[in-house]
Amino acid sequence: MKILSIHDLATIRKRAEHNLSLREESNEKVTEKCYGLASGARHLQILICGGTGCKASSSQGITDNLLKAIQKNEITDKVEVITVGCFGFCEKGPIVKIIPDNTFYTQVTPEDAEEIINEHIIGGRRIERLLYVDPKTEHTVSDSKHMDFYRKQLRIALRNCGFIDPENIEEYIAREGYFALADCLLNKQPTDVIDIIKRSGLRGRGGGGFPTGLKWEFANKQQSDVKYVVCNADEGDPGAFMDRSIMEGDPHSIVEAMCVCGYSIGSTKGLVYIRAEYPLAINRLKTAINQAREYGLLGDHILGTDFSFDIEIRYGAGAFVCGEETALIHSMEGKRGEPTLKPPFPAESGYLGKPTNVNNVETLANIPIILTKGADWFATIGTERSKGTKVFALAGKINNVGLIEVPMGTTLREVIYEIGGGIKGGKKFKAVQTGGPSGGCLTEKHLDTPIDFDNLLSAGSMMGSGGMIVMDEDDCMVSVARFYLDFTVEESCGKCTPCRIGNKRLLELLNKITEGKGTEKDLDTLATLGQVIKDTALCGLGQTSPNPVLSTLDNFYDEYMEHVRDKTCRAKQCKSLLTYTISPERCIGCHLCAKNCPADAISGLVRKPHVIAPDKCIKCGMCMARCKFNAILVC
């Protein structure tokens, strides 16, 4: 149906609220009881993660098998199976959640589906082996509200992910969806909307941290016959999937926010620039756009007003540099994805030379709820200069890996040791890298740093788009810096000399050091050259690319010195600095290592201790992998 008024919108909300009422109620209550048809439950819902990660692990097969088991038991009128967006706890996927008792099943397989129906849904008995096991207590936890991973989170940008069916516009409307747009069109002037966003303190979540309301104001003040709203969905950081998850789990929030932005700056055209490697996010966005058009929330005369707005999707080829707004705009125009010097800013001259407002996905996801709950509500969350929450992709040597959203001001210690569950295997924390490949590596002394834009910069890192990688004692910080620099060298567009040549020289120096050929003078060159690149590169990619090198030099100088002076790697990660030997006490002469050595570097008689020839050894580690007696020593 075409929505022509706020009354039509309210009618749909009332109709759709029934679908969500069971989920809403279960979200509010805490219960240890397991509900099944045998224990008196009249209606149950099974929520299945439909994000990319879980789909890659056969969540669709789980859905299919659940539906078959429901039909087989003739309970189709009592049980619903609903595909939702990402729950965030990606390492434990595929995830299945039972409503109304909030039972949270992890690492479910298609073969588990029939057991879930027979035992839980019909019998009212939880399946213990599918429950989450707390890494600290080693006890099972059935309800996500009791899990440390979720307890300290505050889901604002992710508010609908894992809760609504992302392909059902009416479920989005039932969660106050499109009411912010309606209120803006019917009750507010464009400048009123901009004022609310400014007062909220929302800053860009794509890495720059520029005040969103101020950016909208600049675009609003430009005089032009055509203006554009661009959603930057080109998420290029390795291991980062914040924006992808929002688009997959709550695409209508992006559509609504782009409409609001269009109204605020005087634009009738929106463009989503998304990498083609995100097929599921693309399909969900297409579905949301088509549904919004069908319901009259995109297109001409939205909600019966004079405001018209529509959205197109443009595909990127996955270049990291195209996350920078001027490079992104060039790519959309069919040109090489190269940044340009600012000013002029896109708000003055952007896509096709017209005023263009560019916001990333997470920034836009905050817009509808800010307008619904008010600027003052949002401004009470976070720190003085960084309001609201931030979504992070938490990964690395940590027990709880996944997507998290925390209030600004939450400390790194809280994220790593409470939400993240501490370091895997009880090993010692060494560093945390924030901000993606252009971020810095922070140490134990930084763990009590409150996370916000300014504090992370002061500590020698950055917020970036939200990558957070935790490292333990087995990680070599010189090798880590080399890994990230290798990525930025590959992703450089090559336009400016500091980035194209300077970063290549930095990488050569790091390769030299990890190969045992470095000198103390090389460390001085790294520091000097890194600072020159920061000061002179054209765009954000080049200006921030030396961060991993400079931060590890500052915080782990002793490791660099060990590499260049002692020719050793304490973490045993730099192959050229390792020496493989065989313990004569442990070796029984089984000859297995010699049989598997690709360089024929191991010799010895059967049942006699073997030896490794250092001049032949290529340090591949095959002998260590094959030895069953821990006789291979590395130093």
Language-model features and meaning:
Residues 92-96, 498-504, 592-609, 622-635:
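Iron-sulfur cluster-binding cysteine motifs and their immediate structural context
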